[in-house]
């Protein structure tokens, strides 16, 4: 542990105990006797952690504090139980504040109706902030005299809020309510939503006339707004994408057609730095006002510019870009990633506490590339359907070990580059790896013409190269690669250390594509940085220094 690392806030004794517990596990897990009974100790730690976490929830000032996602948790409210199956099926995280929320209300019947009406919709969209949105919805519903009008407002906006701006959903809802009730004209509601109302499309020119004039930094597409002016602040969130693109560029991410926030898949994951990029690809859907260029499409175009062709799952190479090519073909998906289905339908399996590094499934997510050289055109043919059966048993074992080592090296390199070597508890070696494995792997790689090794690319300082980012995402990221609750990009820019946020976001985005795990980004008003790495089973607890006053901590759920 670095000397300058501070312990968690001493007044929070339970959290400090929890911190020490996992730090102790990190120190002793390689002892022989511990390794021998690792499974038992692992389960015992989970049990202790669950008890501690239950206590932590009770003492924290904010009610939605939950560190890790479990397959099980205790809820005293019987009426809540019927939602458990749906909650687990959608692999979301919800905080058990339902009892307090339900029983503290003067009208349990009305509260129950509110819960039943909104929880399925909130959970199905993005549940990480579902509880708080629900609590604030209740507050809005019962603090206003016009309950019917408020209820209509909540019903109208919650799906849009959850899908697009889940992290600030409550604030958006509150501000929309404020604007909604302070203006009699129904067009104000139309303006707030910024899209369509009763089938009437809002034109960007109309919105532009209503936007409060503020300072904008067009050079990087960043919008600098005064949060005190709620109307201008939330116009930034809800103005149409077309208007945004025309006036402010594209320094933000399109995620699954929702803009900032929501869910993303590999074929929907791309940043456009310039509007010309979008027009060039001609994949614009005017009905949705969103860009539908997928990362696989972008990858193929990018490689084509580099004079590289792809050979996909035994299919003939497609010399020209074919917009109708079905990249979502089930056979194609299974050939890339045998675990893609389990990753998307049961995210909890990849996000569960995994202290046992022996349970890595890296080999199931590995894809290898085989290259042939052409002396004339120097075209690399990447066979994404490389079959491990071409390797002998020894070769497969070495390949598996080296892939795990490479991924760990990649992770540590990225973290070190962001925060310095002394900021994280670095640990790259696995239980059975040795330096001799590297030489053995080189022999196997040369024998079977395996062309990739992430650790070698790191040595070449290619970690941030756009080529490798696309290739890594294509090779190692499951087709169902999912990111939920990405912190609002512009909100990150408003904090004191906006460059650090941006770099952190980019790096973890890259890491998550390599690790092929679901990763959730969420900001909460706390004072600690917590990371759970399912691949290696390491828990890293640390304070996140100098993050500014507005947002102090990033919690990553791996």
Curated annotation (Swiss-Prot):
Keyword field: Plastid
Ranges where the record places region Disordered: 338-380
Predominant cellular place of this UniProt entry's protein: plastid
Protein location: Plastid
GO cellular component, one term: plastid
Low complexity: bias regions: 338-354
Coiled-coil regions listed in the entry: none
Protein name: Uncharacterized 66.5 kDa protein in trnI-trnV intergenic region
């Amino acid at each position: 542990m670095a000397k300058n690392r501070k312990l968690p806030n001493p007044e929070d004794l339970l959290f400090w105990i929890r911190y020490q517990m996992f730090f102790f596990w990190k120190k002793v897990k390689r002892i022989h006797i511990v390794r021998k009974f690792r499974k038992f100790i692992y389960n015992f730690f989970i049990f202790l952690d669950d008890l501690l976490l239950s206590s932590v929830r009770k003492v924290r000032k904010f009610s939605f504090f939950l560190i890790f996602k479990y397959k099980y948790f205790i809820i005293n409210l019987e009426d809540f139980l019927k939602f458990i199956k749906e909650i687990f099926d959608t692999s979301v995280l919800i905080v058990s504040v339902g009892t307090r929320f339900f029983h503290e209300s003067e009208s349990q019947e009305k509260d129950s109706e509110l819960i039943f009406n909104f929880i399925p919709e909130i959970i199905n969209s993005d549940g990480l902030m579902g509880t708080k949105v629900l609590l604030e919805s209740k507050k809005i519903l019962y603090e206003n005299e016009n309950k019917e009008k408020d209820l209509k407002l909540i019903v109208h906006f919650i799906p849009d809020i959850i899908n697009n701006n889940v992290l600030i959903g409550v604030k958006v809802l509150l501000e929309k309510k404020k604007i909604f009730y302070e203006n009699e004209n129904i067009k104000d509601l139309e303006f707030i939503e910024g899209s369509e109302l009763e089938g009437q499309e809002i034109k960007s020119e109309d919105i532009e006339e209503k936007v409060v004039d503020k300072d904008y930094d067009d050079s990087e597409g960043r919008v600098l707004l005064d949060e005190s002016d709620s109307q201008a602040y939330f116009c930034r969130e809800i103005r149409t994408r077309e208007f945004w693109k025309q006036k402010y560029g594209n320094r933000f991410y399109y995620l699954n057609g929702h803009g900032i926030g929501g869910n993303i898949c590999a074929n929907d994951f791309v940043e456009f730095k310039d509007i010309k990029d979008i027009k060039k690809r001609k994949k614009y859907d005017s009905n949705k006002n969103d860009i539908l260029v997928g990362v696989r499409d972008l990858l193929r175009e990018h490689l084509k510019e580099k004079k590289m062709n792809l050979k996909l799952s035994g299919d003939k190479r497609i010399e020209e870009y074919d917009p109708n090519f079905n990249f979502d073909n089930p056979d194609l998906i299974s050939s890339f990633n045998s675990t893609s289905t389990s990753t998307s339908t049961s995210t909890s399996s990849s996000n569960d506490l995994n202290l046992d590094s022996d349970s890595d499934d890296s080999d199931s997510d590995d894809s290898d590339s085989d290259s042939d050289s052409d002396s004339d055109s120097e075209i690399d043919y990447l066979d994404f359907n490389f079959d491990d059966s071409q390797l002998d048993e020894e070769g497969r074992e070495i390949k598996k070990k080296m892939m795990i080592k490479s991924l760990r090296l990649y992770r540590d390199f990225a973290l070190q580059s962001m925060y310095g070597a002394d900021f994280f508890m670095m640990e790259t070696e696995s239980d059975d790896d040795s330096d001799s494995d590297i030489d053995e792997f080189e022999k196997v790689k040369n024998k079977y013409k395996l062309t990739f090794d992430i650790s070698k690319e790191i040595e070449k300082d290619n970690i941030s190269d756009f080529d490798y980012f696309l290739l890594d995402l294509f090779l190692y990221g499951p087709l169902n690669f999912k990111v939920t609750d990405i912190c609002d990009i512009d909100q990150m820019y408003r904090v004191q250390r906006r460059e650090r946020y941006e770099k952190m976001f980019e790096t973890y985005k890259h890491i998550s594509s390599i690790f092929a795990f679901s990763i959730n980004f969420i900001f909460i008003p706390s004072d600690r940085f917590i990371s759970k790495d399912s691949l290696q089973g390491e828990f890293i607890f640390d304070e996140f220094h100098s993050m500014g006053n507005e947002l102090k901590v990033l919690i990553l759920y791996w």
